[in-house]
Amino acid sequence: ASGEGGWGGNGDDMAKGINEKGASGEAAERPPVYAALDFETADYQPDSACAVGLAKVSEGRIVDTLYSLIRPPRHRVLFTWVHGITWKDVCDSPTFGEFWPQMAAFLGDVTHLVAHNAPFDRRVLEACCQAYGLPHPQWPFICTLRASRKQLKLPSHKLDAVCRHYGIPLDHHHAGSDALAAAQLLIHLQRQAREAGKDVTP
């Protein structure tokens, strides 16, 4: 990925450490800005996003959030039992392509995307962008699941378990709540890494 994230570039590697100080060059002179991202999907296809949540982190604080239901490309919602979202809930919602301008504006100053189990959310983001003819996203990703496994000795490192460990409120499988929780988890892990003098690579 390019040093500043965003669109374009020719890299595709999963991102740097959770104690990341920023990209090389000019970007290194400004603090990184993170956006925790969470998708819920309607079916087994990664382009079936039916909800998205984002929470922006700058200098150790959550500074903004964004949430929307999304109308998926197919009417059959298979995972209502997971997230509670039905076709009736999303049939009048914007498609990913229609929502994208608002999401892109939110991500305008973001240098890194963050997710708990980042490969899943990255795959959904890439598939949705491809489905609507949008440029391939090139933000480096930080995976708080991988980071928590390295940093915390817990029986489980699922999002709800790690949130219980830190006392982070969570309405699990609500994309807005999951994104906000991942952002708070990032802040906790960064603080803990700094105190230990470590650079935790997700």
Where are these regions (language model features)?
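Acidic two-metal-ion nuclease catalytic site recognized across multiple nuclease folds
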Residues: 7, 11-30, 185-202
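Conserved beta-strand -> loop -> alpha-helix junction used to position metal-binding or nucleic-acid-contacting
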Residues: 135-148
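Generic alpha-helical structural context detector
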Residues: 146-149, 164, 184-187
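Intrinsically disordered, low-complexity repeat tracts
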Residues: 2-4
